[in-house]
């Protein structure tokens, strides 16, 4: 996804299985952030930062949606544990991460694997 590209209308399904569409946010600003994995330290820090600033973001007219390749059940645990006030897209088939270009080869501790690049739009 590049600046100026049109985002897909159907973003995916949230932690409860509800479809999330881009048109749901018409007239509002949307922060869509991608993260690698629920319940990990870096992703928890990022989600909690957005949680802690959520009221301010809402006052400025923003909505926040997170997305990872974790399933809805895992998202529900992550939301409950960290009291997240926003929805998380369960992109288990990797459709959205591929459309936005945030899925690819990563390296950690000398190991190469496929994963989500931490990215915010």
Residue ranges and their predicted role:
Residues 1-121:
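Chalcogenol-based redox active-site neighborhoods
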């Amino acid at each position: 996804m590049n600046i100026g590209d049109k985002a897909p209308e159907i973003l995916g399904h949230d932690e409860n299985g509800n479809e999330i569409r881009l048109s749901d946010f018409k007239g509002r600003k949307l922060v869509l952030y991608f993260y690698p994995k629920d319940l990990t330290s870096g992703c928890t820090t990022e989600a909690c930062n957005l949680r802690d600033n959520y009221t301010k973001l809402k006052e400025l007219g923003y909505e926040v949606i997170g997305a990872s390749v974790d399933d809805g059940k895992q998202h529900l645990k992550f939301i409950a544990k960290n009291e997240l006030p926003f929805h998380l897209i369960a992109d288990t088939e990797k459709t959205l991460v591929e459309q936005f270009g945030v899925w690819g080869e990563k390296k950690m501790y000398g190991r190469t694997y496929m994963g989500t690049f931490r990215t915010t739009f």
